[in-house]
Amino acid sequence: VIDDQQGNAEYLVGCLNETGNKRRADNVTGLLGGPEFLAYLRAQKEPITKGFFMHVGIDDFGAINSSRGADYGNYILKSVAGCMKECLSDKQRIYHLVADQYVIVDLEASSAEEAVALKEKITDKLHNFIVDENYEAIFSISIGVIDAATFCEGTEECRKKFEFALKQAKSMGKNGFYIFSNLDY
């Protein structure tokens, strides 16, 4: 609030999504969140039969926040989101879930190779970002991928497999990449 000379409120400065409505976009990354991700999937006119969900997590993100502070951590979150967004096609979408986790949605892909290619593109983009930042923060991402048709099994089962895929990727070490398999589940 900016007051006039008499001490009365003259201007109110803020973001439009802070006016009392439930927030849709994340203030740090500018991305839509989990509820919008689910709404997008539920709005599909045809059952989802192809594509993938890519669950992305920044490895050891807590260490960045601890050593450099929350403002720098937020800068990394926004930068990672921006790098990933630049790698997407017009048919792909990205959402910020929680903390250091994102989901990339592709409902058109017909093979796992397309997820692998996107992962490589994102990894290269993030490497270039780290170099451009003079290695101030060195980090990697882990990625778990599930078939988008898993959504048709119900949101709870989809969530479990989605979380499992990222957990498996992270268990492989930094920069892990895992494509869901029922044999491991």
Predicted regions and their residues:
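Output-coupling edge of small sensory domains
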Residues: 1-3, 17, 128, 146
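Short loop/turn elements at sensory-signaling interfaces that couple input to output
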Residues: 1-12
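Sensory-module boundary signal marking interfaces of small helical input modules
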Residues: 5, 19-22, 61, 112, ...
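Sensory beta-sandwich core in regulatory modules of signaling proteins
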Residues: 13-14, 53
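PAS-associated C-terminal
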Residues: 17-18, 56, 107
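Conserved long alpha-helical elements within nucleotide-processing catalytic cores of c-di-GMP signaling
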Residues: 24-52, 59-85, 95-99, 104, ...
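Residue-level recognition of strand-loop junctions within catalytic nucleotide-signaling folds
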Residues: 66, 105-110, 127, 147-149
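Cyclic nucleotide signaling catalytic output domains
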Residues: 94, 121, 125, 136, ...
